[in-house]
From Swiss-Prot:
Its cofactor is Zn(2+). This is 5-methyltetrahydropteroyltriglutamate--homocysteine methyltransferase. The gene is metE. One of its GO terms (molecular function) is 5-methyltetrahydropteroyltriglutamate-homocysteine S-methyltransferase activity. L-methionine binds at I435, G436, S437, E488, D603.
Amino acid sequence: MTTAHILGFPRIGAQRELKFALERYWRDGASADAERALVDTGRALRAEHWRIERDAGLDCVTVGDFAWYDHVLTTLAHVGGLPRRFGFDARALTLADYFAAARGNAAQPAMEMTKWFDTNYHYLVPEYSPATTFGPGVEWLFDEVREARALGYRAKAALVGPLTLLWLGKARDGLVERLALLPRLVPAYRALLARLREAGVDWVQIEEPIFSLDLPDAWRDAARPTYEALAPGAPKLLVATYFDDASEHAALLKALPVAGLHIDLVRADAQLDAFVADYPADKVLSCGIVDGRNVWRNDLDRSLARLAPVRDALGERLWVATSCSLLHVPVDLAHEPRLDEELKTWLAFAAQKTREVAALRDALVKGRAAVAAEFDDAAAAAAARRTSARIHNPLVKRRVAALTDADARRASAYSVRAAAQRARFGLPLLPTTTIGSFPQTPEIRRARAAFKQGVLDHLGYLEAMREQVRIAIDKQLAYGLDVLVHGEAERNDMVEYFGELLWGFAITSNGWVQSYGSRCVKPPLVYGDVYLPEPMTVGWASYAQSLSAKPVKGMLTGPVTMLQWSFVRDDQPRATTALQIALALRQETLDLEKAGIGMIQIDEPALREGLPLKARERAAYLDWAVRAFGIAASGVADDTQIHTHMCYSEFGDILPSIAALDADVISIETTRSNMELLDAFETFDYPNEIGPGVYDIHSPRVPDADEIERLILLALERIPAQRLWVNPDCGLKTREWRQVDAALAAMVDAAKRVRQKVEEEAPA
């Protein structure tokens, strides 16, 4: 019979139980009582998630999708591969050890974090050296198998695959090629798989998403010998790809000695034909047709029509699944009592998606009539969504259609604008500023909570936030900063804040997803055409500007970042939605300019994150991303200065696109790289002004003026003084005022010192 399964379920719990248990554990110093409470929370969450999967009608539950912090770190713990610098005993690894690797300890910094492929989830980056070894590790996966079996469930285990585990890591200490470690890693996997078989596990989902990438030949060539070594003595192996098209590797994957393959039909529907053609008779094909990365309800009839020919070709060897793990979506729509009822009918969170998978299985096996009520309801919701006036705004569509190339370009070249801006603002050499946000203090959080709970009225809330703006301006004047910001006290999140004010966005009450560890985010929903009904930031910026003669920057989140950090409608191209957001932001920039705000910062920290996994698709993405920024930024006069901020670890491959944004000033995160990131800008001969970060805001450590002066001098080796700004790496919302006070005072002092040196050395 056709099998229904999911690749994984969210870990955090419907009420973020894991988040709060982790934070209690860390706060209580990892005491024995705190550890027992954390372990109990994890066990209860797993049992609840398996119950949801069973009640939905899935044929098996997934174990191994749970992780205390991150599934890549947990996989390393299973195969004894945590970084050697921590000195942990792999077989006796404790939770405290595990969290030390994730968060650092007194002796060692934390492992690096980066984005999981093109998602907004962060994984901990494995560290590989010539001395890296693998072997038996923790028992956690086997504990989960025993828990599931004790509850009467048929368990399918999930593991990150060995090739992906190596690919995701970084080579250190002279290691030339990560693949050189494969002969050491494969035996550890083989032993782990053999033990799973002994534990009664029939199937292991072994995840190799790197087969959705443009893989070098050496990595492709490693696949067959790896799985020839793993298959004997293992349970049945289901090799899972997801996030993009794996069809260029279809022949290779179909030839692997495994029991099945999984492909993502949401991100890459066209690859199905390449896999079904000549599909081996000894393999199942798991079709990921329910979206694991977005929140929209499945069009069950459309999915059934897509799967029916596959069922006819493969029979019971067709499996129905989510496209990827449900880690990336909220847990349960039932916990959204305040969300608009019509909008709710268009949505499916993790709990609902498990049922969609099972319903499709039932229709394939028993016929649509067996699940007619569910299918009819889904069809009605899809029809309503297609025609809803709430989604389709003719005015917005006309405005997008009327856009021209000129709308995405400033009226004058940078050199002309720079002269106009120098005349308007009269800033000193090496002007000092910050990136935007200041500490979100307990007072701010209490006022926001009281306002949301109805305890504090609107006027009371406005006055509380205005007081925070006054504090921020007074402090910046005391530091001696040249360009000020209002501090963003009123913003709970740089995307959600705007989502609450733009038409076409909706905000959930409990739509949390895990970003990393205990960090959760609540992405807005972009459900319809985006429109700006009234100014969003003008009041705050104008009030701040009224408190000082120095320029105050208006602060906006850019269109691509708004898109990347939201759940975006799937009924039109993302590029179209980006242009709609850009038009709304364009109106906001014009409103700010009209109110006398002469500097406007449009942040795009997610521009690089949006790059498609396939190289052939990146140029098209960068074209519309740059155009969207241009639409947002280009309506203003020459003497209005546009800033942007980006925080990446590498810029080289997208520098032409960054230059094409044509922002007057770009600030970037460079402190940890010791200004080496500026090398790419120097080589490229970046033409506009740059503010390389000189203060690492991600650390509680406060730099002194000498340290910051050294960094400014390093920056001057690469960037002319006339185009150099001085600023922190990023926003300061996560820091404490005592840290900010000391660091920014030191930054201004350092800038003044270097300014004096440059002016003294300038030819008379």
